UniProtKB/Swiss-Prot annotation:
Keywords: Ribonucleoprotein, Ribosomal protein. This is Large ribosomal subunit protein bL17. One of its GO terms (molecular function) is structural constituent of ribosome. GO terms for biological process: translation. Belongs to the bacterial ribosomal protein bL17 family. It comes from Chlamydia felis (strain Fe/C-56) (Chlamydophila felis). It comes from the Bacteria. Pfam families: Ribosomal_L17. The lineage of its organism: Bacteria, Pseudomonadati, Chlamydiota, Chlamydiia, Chlamydiales. Part of the 50S ribosomal subunit. Contacts protein L32.
Amino acid sequence: MQHARKKFRVGRTSAHNRCMLANMLKSLIHQERIETTLPKAKELRRCADKMITLAKKNTLAARRLAVARLMVRYNKLTSKEARQAKAGDLSVYNVDRKVINKLFDELGTRFVSRQGGYTRILKLQNRVGDNARKCIIEFLAN
């Protein structure tokens, strides 16, 4: 029996779920507002609240833990990114670093006085193709 054991299940493998949540969390931190389906947003809210709590501590250990949870890759580039870097576009190296800096410098300081509930989920109309429940997840203004 699985009493009180919440698992995020959307019909994917656990590695795919981890990577998908890390990518969605990076997008949420970078843009502060994304549109997704309701089950993904509910799981993303749990992860985002934990990351903001880490960012409020603003220690080296918290930064390292955030880098690990966001699966930040500083030296691993895809073949497309390697071609861009060879061509002189060095912005491919800075995307994840910007996300970490924004998390700790902007979002961590914005929510210092707040004890929890850093995100909000706004429900939208269902998607036309498959009738999936759509929503917007965003960080609160303050």
